[in-house]
Amino acid sequence: AAPEPPAPEPPEPDPHYVAAAKQRRKIPIWAMATLSLMPVWGFMYVRALTESPEEAEGPLAEGVEVYANCASCHGAEGGGGVGYAFANGEVLETFPHIEDQIRYVVWGTEGYNLAGVEVYGNPEREGGAHVTGGLGAMPAFGAQLTEHEIVSVICHERYVLSGADPTSEEYADEFEHWCSEEAPVWNAVDTGTFSLFSNDVPTVADDAGDPIEVMPIGDPVEGSPAG
């Protein structure tokens, strides 16, 4: 009988790093496209975290900082406390006109008492008019804040805390003239061409040069009804 051919020699074992590579789980082809985008998404994510947001300007930006002087009495969110609430339209019910609110903040309870003025806001307010000293004593911030700070914080109280709609027919003009970033009345107060302490009718024009109807602030007087 013919001799049997010699058995083939067994293959040499793979080096450990080759064996490990063969045993490693392979990444599916479909996942490769996703993984290839990870550096791009990572860059965009980090950029979003590090880019500084655009800072707000104008009365509302200043007003939120000035409101720290008011929060202890009226609540951090305007919910009330020692002083009346501002939230949910409350301050708008009391002061349909921003000028009346500014005047009361300037003179406070003592100023109105000395002038003999009892009703500082809307005399026809639903639920009854608010009277001077009816709930705590309002400080006279005309001696503590600048005039443009007073306007700014009142813009914050009306449009942020109380929820006045700056796009509504009722408040669009007031917001544009007093509380927008380019508000001409606020700018006039800031530059000193309109003083909150004057009893004279202020002369302020809009961007088109048309006069803006503004009630003088001046000395304490009874508040005005809506309309």
Language-model regions, residue ranges each:
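Short, Lys/Arg-rich cytosolic juxtamembrane segment immediately N-terminal
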Residues: 16-28
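Hydrophobic membrane-insertion alpha-helices, especially the h-region
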Residues: 27-45
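The canonical Cys-X-X-Cys-His
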Residues: 63-76, 138, 153-157
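Gly/Gly-Pro-rich "capping" loops immediately C-terminal to redox-active cysteine motifs
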Residues: 75-146
